Amino acid sequence: MSSPDQDPREAIAQGDDEVIDVRRGMFGAAGTGDTSGYGRLVRTVTLPGSSPRPYGSYFDDVVDTLTESLQSNGIEFHQAIEKVVVYRDELTLHVDRAALPHVAQHLRDDPRLRFEMCLGVSGVHYPHETGRELHAVYPLQSITHNRRVRLEVAVPDEDPHIPSLYRIYPTTDWHERETYDFFGIVFDGHPSLTRIEMPDDWHGHPQRKDYPLGGIPVEYKGAQIPPPDERRAYN
């Protein structure tokens, strides 16, 4: 817990890499007659921990400005941001899911930040990261300042709900639907959260790592393609 006199940006301590899995062998090598030696590979799977200050480039300015902007609305930085990661010259803010709309709104509307564009939504599944198995990643672009930042939110399998950013970034409309379709993340507040690529009656979410591979025919039962001027519009 931070003290009252502590800089709120320092309340997020530097963290070690987080080990989420240990993988052994090659793809499908277990129990085979593999004699190459690769079957004995052991690889630790890690996620980067919190990065120390200074972050470098424009990253410190973005974090400082976001801190001030959030505080002006009574939101403490360390309550909204779980960790700040600089990895391979990219800035990622790991956001508490309840604070996601507030953080996105400030990043978009503060004239010193002006991240006007959300470039998409990506889903990630880490089945061995207990309590944080599903991640949603939002790359944001500031056209005004020529800067980029990435937001990342993690939720458990048992409660895969994240607030939709559709009202703030309408471009996330189909991206959130695709992430729901393939990973099962439910974006609360989305105006039309339905499958976008798989059939409506499909069971499961095909890009999760626990989804069975191959051999399932995809059937769009009773599908009819109307003429272009009669096709439904999505929002």
Swiss-Prot record:
Its membrane topology: Peripheral membrane protein
Catalytic activity: a quinone + NADH + 5 H(+)(in) = a quinol + NAD(+) + 4 H(+)(out)
GO cellular component: plasma membrane
Alphabetical keyword list: Cell membrane, Membrane, NAD, Quinone, Translocase, Transport
Gene Ontology terms, MF aspect: NADH dehydrogenase (ubiquinone) activity; NADH:ubiquinone reductase (non-electrogenic) activity; quinone binding
InterPro entries: NADH_DH_suC, NADH_quin_OxRdtase_su_C/D-like, NADH_UbQ_OxRdtase_30kDa_su
Pfam families assigned to the protein according to its UniProt record, in alphabetical order: Complex1_30kDa
Domain of life per record: Bacteria
EC number annotated for this UniProt entry: 7.1.1.-
Protein localization: Cell membrane
Quaternary structure and interacting proteins, as annotated: NDH-1 is composed of 14 different subunits. Subunits NuoB, C, D, E, F, and G constitute the peripheral sector of the complex.
Function: NDH-1 shuttles electrons from NADH, via FMN and iron-sulfur (Fe-S) centers, to quinones in the respiratory chain. The immediate electron acceptor for the enzyme in this species is believed to be a menaquinone. Couples the redox reaction to proton translocation (for every two electrons transferred, four hydrogen ions are translocated across the cytoplasmic membrane), and thus conserves the redox energy in a proton gradient.
PANTHER family on file: NADH DEHYDROGENASE [UBIQUINONE] IRON-SULFUR PROTEIN 3, MITOCHONDRIAL, NADH DEHYDROGENASE UBIQUINONE IRON-SULFUR PROTEIN 3
Recorded family membership: Belongs to the complex I 30 kDa subunit family.
Listed name of the protein: NADH-quinone oxidoreductase subunit C
Native species: Mycolicibacterium paratuberculosis (strain ATCC BAA-968 / K-10)
